[in-house]
Every structure is written in structure tokens, then in C-alpha cells.
């Protein structure tokens, strides 16, 4: 058995990223340690962690460069501040009692270290790698993260280097702005004026996709890179193919019509799950949504109770939302759509809605920002992590 730890600390070109393995010298970590020291690789030469020349840290630690070292400047950074930082972090942890009840002569540590080719500041390189090594080591010893922490954090996480956040819908209720538009100028205006908010979803409506194709998702993404974007394709056939097309276009969710054959719906849901996007069933003109959900072998992420624009003057009737959630096994978001106005938001939420789909009340407003804020005020939901102080993650 061996333990695994990881940590990223710092900023700019000098940031440090350490992947760490700790295990018995008699096991796979010990074998990998011996192979690393005895089988050198050009540009990725492993080096033992020493506090200073002739002073090996304990437990014995080998450092593996993650990035090919192409010039002497990078070599000096790896054999200088990185080597010293890793060794000192391990030695300090030993002094602090991190290895209590562990035979330090019986274990080995492998630390993979990242040095950006543009890194220059030795002081920052040292301090960031020291912190990252120490944090990675303690995470390994603590078996961090536990399952509860991982599940809690996974959908609110933003990768430090990726540059954008993949939104997930774990904190309802949400406001979905439906852009059933055919003018890209108007689309740009809406995207510019709708406030940035964790509880806003952007929908590329069916007319918009029919006119401009799925490429419109990419255009929306350019203006709102962190938005949760729905491709309202109302799939009726080739469910798996069209769901994959939506994912390839960078949509976060795809809509399949509840009037489609059951096999088409199931294929769309399965494909959406496979590629990591949400599946939505539009229940427009479906007489018994709960019954449809119940008979599906794979359940959708979201059900949209959608009254068509042509019939939205009729009374607000969203059906038995609790029955639909029960049919889906309890883990289902329900969206209500069609003529949603500010004065009926509370009724929809009380009925069990998780997502309020609003179109013309926002997109046709003379003050799009203010109109959106009115709906958001009704949701009574603060920004995710607004008051959270971020440290390690």
C-alpha cells in the first residue's frame, strides 16, 4: 500500500505543483524509487532531495521533473531552489512529528515537481515548492480528501490553471435566461446586460440554434466563458449523436423532447452522462411526465415543464413535481417554463421548481439588467462562496 498527495501553491510562472507518493521501500514505491535513481532520462533526470550538498533528507526522497529541462537555467532551478525546498519541507515535517510511528528508514518518497520554463524568481520558486511539498505530504498522510470533502467540493471547484470554471447545478434555485432569438446583435446585448451571477443559466433557444447552428454555443461562450449553457435542441431522433454534438459544441446541457421515442430519450441521456453534460427532457405536450420518467431505464438530470408560447396565457399548472422527483429516484431538478413573470416566481418555487425559465420578460425588457435582478431577488440566493475565504482549495 502507498499514500498519494498533491498540492498546488503560488502564482505566476513560479507556481509550484507537487505530486507525491509515499510507501514502503519493499513495495511499488520503493521499486519506482530505485528505478528513478538508477535509470536516468534526458530532460527528466531524477535527483535526490538534499537539504544541502552531502545532507540527504529523511525519509529518502527523489524528485522527478515534470517538465523537460531544456537549458541550464531550468536545470539550476530544479537542482537549486526546488531541490532545497522539497528536502527542507520533508525534514521540517520529520521534526514536527509527521512521521510518528513510521519507520523512516523503511519508506521512500517520490515527489514530481513542476517548474515553468519562464520561472525566474528563485525565492518564490523555493517558497512555493516548500509549501506545496509540505501540503502534499500532509495530505498523503491524512488521506485527504475524504469522500465527504470530495463530493462537497467537486462542483464548486475551479482549476487553478485551466482558466475557466465548469459550472454545475448543485445549489438551486436558478434563473434560466431563454434566448429564443434570431438576431446575434440582440444575443450579444442580452449576454452583456444580464448580470454575472452563479445562479444564472444561459439557454441557446431552439430558434437561435436552428438559425445559426450549434456554433452559436461557441459564440455565447466567448462572451460568457464561465456560464452554464443549455442547447435547447428538442431532440426527436438520433439521441446519442445529437447529445454528443451539443457536448462537442461546449454546451453544458442538452434538451431532448419528451415526445421522442423512449429509446431516443434514453440514448440522449446516456450519451450526455458519458460526455459529462446534463440531460434535460422537455415535457411539452407530454400528458404524464412522472409516468414517462418512471419507465426510463436511465433518468434525466432535469425535467422541463414547458408551456408553449402559443398557450402560455392559460393558468400556471406545472403538475405534480414531487411525484416526478420520486419517479426519478429523488435526484432530479425541475424547471418551469412558459410565461414566467416575477409575480409567479414564489408560486413556482413553492410548487417544487428548481429552475425558473424566463424568456421575453428579460430578453425583451428595456432594462435587461434590472429585469434579471428582479427575478434573482425572488430566488433569495446569495452568490456561491461569496463569503468563503479560500486557502488550500
UniProtKB/Swiss-Prot annotation:
HAMAP family: Fae_Hps. The keyword Cell wall biogenesis/degradation does not apply. Keywords: Carbohydrate metabolism, Lyase, Multifunctional enzyme. Substrate binds at residues 19, 48, 66, 68, 83. The lineage of its organism: Archaea, Methanobacteriati, Methanobacteriota, Stenosarchaea group, Methanomicrobia. In the N-terminal section; belongs to the formaldehyde-activating enzyme family. In the C-terminal section; belongs to the HPS/KGPDC family. HPS subfamily. It is an enzyme of class 4 (lyase). It holds the Pfam family Fae. It comes from Methanoregula boonei (strain DSM 21154 / JCM 14090 / 6A8). Signal peptide: none annotated. SUPFAM superfamilies: Ribosomal protein S5 domain 2-like, Ribulose-phoshate binding barrel. Catalyzes the condensation of formaldehyde with tetrahydromethanopterin (H(4)MPT) to 5,10-methylenetetrahydromethanopterin. Catalyzes the reversible formation of ribulose-5-phosphate and formaldehyde from 3-hexulose-6-phosphate. Residues 1-161 are annotated as: Formaldehyde-activating enzyme. The active site is at 17 (proton donor). Its EC number is 4.2.1.147, 4.1.2.43. It catalyses: 5,6,7,8-tetrahydromethanopterin + formaldehyde = 5,10-methylenetetrahydromethanopterin + H2O; D-ribulose 5-phosphate + formaldehyde = D-arabino-hex-3-ulose 6-phosphate. Residues 162-393 are annotated as: 3-hexulose-6-phosphate synthase. It comes from the Archaea. One of its GO terms (molecular function) is hexulose-6-phosphate synthase activity. One of its GO terms (biological process) is carbohydrate biosynthetic process. This is Bifunctional enzyme Fae/Hps. Pathway: Carbohydrate biosynthesis; D-ribose 5-phosphate biosynthesis.
Amino acid at each position: 500500500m502507498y499514500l498519494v498527495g498533491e498540492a498546488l501553491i503560488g502564482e505566476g510562472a513560479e507556481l509550484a505543483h507537487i505530486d507525491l507518493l509515499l510507501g514502503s521501500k519493499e513495495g511499488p514505491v520503493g521499486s519506482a524509487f530505485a528505478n528513478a535513481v538508477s535509470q536516468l532520462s534526458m530532460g527528466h533526470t531524477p535527483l535526490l532531495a538534499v537539504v544541502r550538498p552531502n545532507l540527504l533528507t529523511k525519509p529518502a526522497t527523489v524528485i522527478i521533473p515534470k517538465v523537460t529541462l531544456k537549458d541550464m537555467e531550468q536545470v539550476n532551478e530544479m537542482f537549486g531552489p526546488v531541490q532545497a525546498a522539497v528536502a527542507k519541507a520533508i525534514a521540517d515535517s520529520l521534526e514536527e512529528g509527521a512521521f510518528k510511528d513510521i519507520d523512516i528508514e523503511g519508506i521512500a518518497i517520490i515527489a514530481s515537481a513542476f517548474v515553468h520554463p519562464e520561472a525566474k524568481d528563485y525565492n518564490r520558486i523555493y517558497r512555493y515548492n516548500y509549501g506545496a511539498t509540505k501540503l502534499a505530504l500532509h495530505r498523503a498522510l491524512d488521506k485527504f480528501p475524504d469522500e465527504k470533502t470530495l463530493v462537497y467540493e467537486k462542483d464548486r471547484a475551479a482549476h487553478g490553471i485551466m482558466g475557466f470554471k465548469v459550472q454545475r447545478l448543485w445549489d438551486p434555485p436558478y434563473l434560466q435566461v431563454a434566448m429564443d432569438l434570431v438576431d446575434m446583435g440582440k444575443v450579444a446585448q442580452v449576454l452583456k446586460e444580464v448580470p454575472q451571477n452563479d445562479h444564472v443559466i444561459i439557454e441557446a433557444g431552439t430558434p437561435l440554434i436552428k438559425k445559426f447552428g450549434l456554433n452559436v454555443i461557441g459564440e455565447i461562450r466567448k462572451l460568457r466563458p464561465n456560464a452554464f449553457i443549455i442547447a435547447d435542441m428538442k431532440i426527436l431522433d438520433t439521441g446519442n449523436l445529437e447529445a454528443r454534438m451539443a457536448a462537442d459544441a461546449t454546451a453544458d446541457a442538452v434538451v431532448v423532447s419528451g415526445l421522442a421515442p423512449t429509446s431516443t430519450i434514453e440514448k440522449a441521456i446516456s450519451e450526455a452522462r458519458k460526455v459529462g453534460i446534463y440531460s434535460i427532457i422537455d415535457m411539452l405536450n407530454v400528458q404524464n411526465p412522472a409516468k414517462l420518467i418512471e419507465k426510463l431505464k436511465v433518468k434525466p438530470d432535469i425535467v422541463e415543464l414547458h408551456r408553449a408560447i402559443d398557450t402560455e396565457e392559460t393558468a400556471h399548472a406545472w403538475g405534480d413535481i414531487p411525484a416526478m422527483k420520486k419517479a426519478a429516484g429523488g435526484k432530479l431538478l425541475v424547471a418551469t417554463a412558459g410565461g414566467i413573470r416575477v409575480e409567479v416566481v414564489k408560486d413556482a418555487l413553492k410548487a417544487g421548481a428548481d429552475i425558473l425559465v424566463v424568456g421575453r420578460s428579460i430578453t425583451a425588457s428595456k432594462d435587461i439588467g434590472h429585469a434579471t435582478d428582479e427575478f434573482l431577488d425572488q430566488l433569495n440566493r446569495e452568490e456561491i462562496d461569496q463569503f468563503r475565504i479560500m486557502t488550500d482549495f
